[in-house]
Amino acid sequence: MKKIISMFSLVLIGLGNVQGQGMKKEAMMPDVSSWPEASKMAVKEITDKYGKPDGVTANELIWMNKGVWKKICITKMETKHSFPIEHTDMMQTTIMYKVPEDKMDELGVFDGSVTFDRTQGTMSARCDMEGNNFLALNLAHDIITGKKTVDEARKAYGDIVKEKMNGGNPEYMQKLTFATQENTMDPDKNTTGLTKADVMNGGKGK
């Protein structure tokens, strides 16, 4: 009898663990029901393609190392953006890419939603759909490699979006047309002469 009771207890414990795991898993599922419609659509697009996010807060979802992306971040907050047409930005996708110093200003003129982090060695695009981020980064690469001027890239952006809206399937919106890079981080150089010891001593030296 004791043996039967013990077995029954183990079954109950096992069921409790499974239910507990299920509840924990369900708790990790993001609730975006109160988010703006465009942000919810972005979440659905990325979740359908890459699965559940790796990080969840009340205002943003994060996926790490999915497809070609080092990071994908979708935010509840949307930012108005008028280029190439009126829309809002909320989906940022990031790749490993070393932007040459002499091209940094040109990228800023091309599209304010294409950004880079020289220290981390990344380049990002922030728009409303993955395809638009592919497009922005592909055109940014064209500028960096000298294939297009800033004006040519901005015109191409509009032309390609029109093609897509008219039922086309432009390559620049399907994937990155170039390979992402490695070893792109740039720690910069110490040109101040200061050391950690100097900082700890308030710059007074030893």
Which residues make up each language-model segment?
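Non-cytosolic coordination micro-motifs
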Residues: A27-K71, T75-K206
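Amphipathic, positively biased hydrophobic alpha-helical segments used for protein targeting
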Residues: S9-V11, I62
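Sec-dependent signal peptide recognition
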Residues: K2-M7
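Hydrophobic h-region of N-terminal signal peptides that target proteins for export
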Residues: V11-V18
